[in-house]
Design a protein with these regions (language model features):
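Terminal signal-anchor or tail-anchor transmembrane helices
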Residues: 1-3, 28
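Extended, non-globular alpha-helical segments
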Residues: 3-14
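Gly/Ser-rich catalytic/binding loops embedded in alpha/beta enzyme cores
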Residues: 12-19, 26, 31-203, 207
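Short, hinge-like loop/turn segments at secondary-structure boundaries
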Residues: 168-171, 218-222
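Structural signature of FAD isoalloxazine-binding scaffolds in flavoprotein oxidoreductases
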Residues: 212-217
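A short core secondary-structure module
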Residues: 227-233
């Protein structure tokens, strides 16, 4: 749920004008009820002003402590290193908190949409150049502080837009319990890795089944909690 606010002053310099919504919809054969036209104009104007306010805020990027948590041997895995087709996106090692923690000794893989500073992100695609984050996602920081060791990023489906496991530009991911069959998606590589016991935990993201589907295909229990042999979000 998103709520936008507006004031009368927003209209004085706002580029959204009456009739803009109707003009945008016309090529698609869609119309707006004239009785609702003003409401749509008000909403779009408010969205614009809210977006402008957010865009004007100073950027904040937390700087990861790469002295405490160095990234070791970041690489695209060799054919010999790969498992279940192309389950790994990148291999590397970031050792967790040397003082230990509740996840000490646990091995982690991260879906290749989760930012890790210094590790290129493929997003299962080849239509855009890989992007290398300069900061760690919050979940990465929390895992390391809790003592977990991160062993790499796992292959996800192309732009995460599939619940299969054959759309990634980096290659297919096979089901560890039935090789040659789908591992599900879009957290395809992560589900295969944790189901096979190669890592203890994999971290994914789920808006439309991207954890639930591969977890069910690979025989894992997905959870928002800490469970044995689970794919978590």
């Amino acid at each position: 749920m998103v709520i936008f606010s507006y004031t009368d002053s927003c209209y004085r310099s706002n580029p959204v004008k009456p009739g803009d919504a109707e003009a945008l919809l016309k090529p698609y054969g869609l119309t707006i009820d004239p009785a609702e036209a003003q409401d749509f104009h008000t909403l779009l104007a408010a969205v614009h002003d809210c977006a402008e306010s957010v865009a004007a805020l100073p950027d904040y990027q937390p700087v990861p402590d790469q002295t405490k948590y160095p990234r070791e041997d970041v690489r695209r895995p060799s054919e010999k290193e790969q498992v279940f087709g192309q389950a790994w996106a990148h291999r590397f090692l970031i050792r967790g908190n040397p003082q230990g923690g509740p996840l000490a000794g646990k091995s982690i893989s991260l879906k290749d949409v989760i930012a890790v500073a210094g590790v290129p992100q493929l997003l299962g695609s080849d239509i855009i150049p890989s992007w290398t984050p300069s900061t760690d996602a919050t979940v990465v920081t929390r895992l390391l502080e809790a003592g977990a060791d991160i062993h790499g990023t796992s292959t996800c489906e192309n732009m995460c837009h599939s619940t299969s496991s054959y759309t990634s530009a980096q290659g297919t991911v096979e089901n560890p319990n039935a090789q040659g069959y789908s591992a599900g998606g879009s957290t395809s590589g992560g589900a295969a890795l944790v189901a096979a016991g190669i890592v203890d935990i994999t971290i994914g993201g789920d808006q439309g089944g991207s954890i639930r589907v591969p977890a069910s295909f690979c025989g894992c229990k997905m959870s928002f909690l800490l469970e044995d042999k689970c794919v978590t979000s």
